Amino acid sequence: MSPVVSERLLSFDNRIVNQEELNRIGINLDFDKLDLSLNLSLSRDDARQNQFSFDVPYEKPLYSEAGLFSWHNIFNLTTNYIDSELDTSQLDWRVEWISNGNIGGYQGLNLESSVYAVPDELNLDESMKIYRGDIRAFVDRPEYPLRFTIGDITPYSAGHLPSTTLGGISMERLWNRLQPTRNIKSGGSQDIYLVESATVGVYINGTFYGDIRLPPGRYSIDDLPLRQGDNDILLSIRYQSGRREEITYSQFFNTRLLKKGFSDYGIYAGVISEVVEREYSYDTDQTVGQLYYDYGLTDSLTIGLNGLYHNLGQIAGFSLGIGTGDSNIGFRGSILSYSESQESDSFGYIASIDFSTILWGNLNSSSANFRSSFESFYDYRSTPWQTEDDIESGNRGLVSYTYRLYNNVNLNTYVQVDTFQDPVRYDITGQLELEINYFGFDVTLGIEHQQNYDLVTSDETTYYAIIGWDWYSDDGNYEFLAQYFTRENVTRATFNKYSSNTVGSYGYQLNAERSDILQSYEARANYVGNRYSAEIDVSRFDDNEGVFTANSVSGRLSTGFTMVDSDISWNRGYRGPTAIVSVHDSLEVPVHINEFIGDSPEAIATSTLSNSVPLYSGHSSSSFDVSIPDAPIGYDYGSGYYQITPGTYTGHVVHVGSDEAKTVIGSLVDINGKPIGLRNGIVSGEGVTRSIFTNKAGRFAIDRMKSGTFKVTIIGKLQYTGILVIDDVDKNLIYLNPVALKEVLP
């Protein structure tokens, strides 16, 4: 409450205050006749304003004890049966083994690898083909922070540097991974690498464009169905092992602003690597060195340098980021050198300026509604050494503006102009959209004009509409989505029942899509078990002309295996740091992990077979709970709450239950039978030391005890000593006869 209200309350002193007096100072007190309760609330003007900031000071984490050796494994099995009129293999399958490990704790050696097996269709003498994915080893130094990596690496593409994949070494200052709780206003890499099979949901500018089922591999954002210019993209990735991830980015250049005094950099060196027919190829004739360095001169000004060396081409560039309140300006410039003989000059350049701000018509939204970008390039090729690509000169400019008429009505405009030299050509694209959102309905009405001047001149105007309805149940477990796209005359409907990450959870999805070309139907169901997850889907594709029909059935199974020193567990597949929950032999009932009211547990461990719980984020604190609903009466297994700060791939072991799980209740008396009340002391023996307290009647209760003989010492002005015996019985709640103590004479 505000200080004024506090002072008025104090002025009432100790007298009785009626409801009207409380209402006058902004305190509302209402009596609920249904449940006989009092509801107390403050008026808005009299409530104290609390300020919350995510810019909290960084505190160096206190890392938890980890195993010397940890090994995390995910095993995925995928089978597909296709019945079609095309001459293709009907039965297909794939086995995936994704492995991560750590030796030596959070500052030790981390390992990443993956191995896959598929039918060998080219070699009839062998039944399967085994190939690998990216393999790398790295060491973290989170206090700096720095990561040193050797193996298959993907450098961060700063400025105009191309996206490359190398076999080599790197040194990176990965703030967001090694110090994830520190706020430096830094962005992250936008590369996409799927280490295991996944279903990728594609959302572009808020519109769902469908799911793509992808096997493990490297994928470029250029492979997605994006339009030129402004694209706000969300990739919702659902891995086969059950892990989920979301990647969001914009096709506009994202200016990186660092806090004053903070730097971010990466240094990479190696040879070009390519994956051809699932085989890794390292071209030792193509050596690459790449680096970037960004530094925050002030909180609103960041400068950067970047460069790349290749024996057939080099790039040197700079970047400048300026933040001015609601606006951001980014400058990038690069000079390119080509070493091979060619008709054009041996040097080229590219310069870009990107601007975003909040303009009139943004209502109360804090996101930028005006974006513009201009780029000029001369004798430019994005990857200098790829001589098969053309060298181009020209300019590119685009402007995007959103006018928010109401909270649910937007007017979007977009214009892009591309001009090229030698030969002279240009492309102009203009777009105007009216977007209306109302009670789950999303209606977009648009007009697009495209004009191209090349060897063939074209001028086309298109009118289109996108109509959708998205419904969620109140509990968020069910969704129905219906969409219609006039451009391709596509109608799509999807009904989802989402599963949760708990034992026994299940989900399903029904999809139907129809267009002028084809129609497709799909039914998918998934189940989350205690130590595995499974998914099955059935689909059908029909060519509307009756030329092609295909039916397919797919099944996917995922499980995991974790080892930390000598402890092992069978669990669902988890990537990242993990804690094994090991149950003591004295517990013959299951232990539930992360069981919340009204939900099933996320996992169940038993004394015969341990289970694991993911810690999700390395170098920051993670917590989980264990509970034992069927625990024996009196069995003490502690608070059940565990908090662990892991490294990137460290493994941890939590022991639930022990021999010291008995609860003992009794009383202390002196040799005359008089209660020793309101006293404290120590109970020790059998390797156990516990505190003891008595009430006025001399009664006490001690938890976490074991069977055996113990010495009782009562301290204070009058000291007592004696022996307490706990018999070896199966019961965990034990009531003792009065324990007689002798007074210790001075």
Across the structure, where does each feature detected by a protein language model lie?
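Outer-membrane beta-barrel channel domains
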Residues: 2-261, 317-324, 332-389, 522-590, ...
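Residues that define the transmembrane beta-barrel architecture of outer-membrane proteins
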Residues: 89-95, 127-131, 261, 285-289, ...
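Repeated loop/turn-to-beta-strand initiation elements of outer-membrane beta-barrel proteins
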Residues: 103-112, 143-148, 198-200, 299-304, ...
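Short Pro-Gly-centered beta-turn/loop motif in secreted/extracellular proteins
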Residues: 224-230, 607-636, 648, 696-711, ...
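Structured interaction patches on ligand/partner-binding surfaces of diverse proteins
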Residues: 245-251, 603-606, 630-652, 716-744
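Outer-membrane beta-barrel "beta-signal"
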Residues: 459-481, 493, 552-564
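Short, ordered, surface-exposed loop/turn motifs in non-cytosolic proteins
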Residues: 586-600, 670-687
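Short, acidic Ser/Thr/Gly-rich low-complexity loop/linker segments typical of extracellular
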Residues: 598-611, 686-699
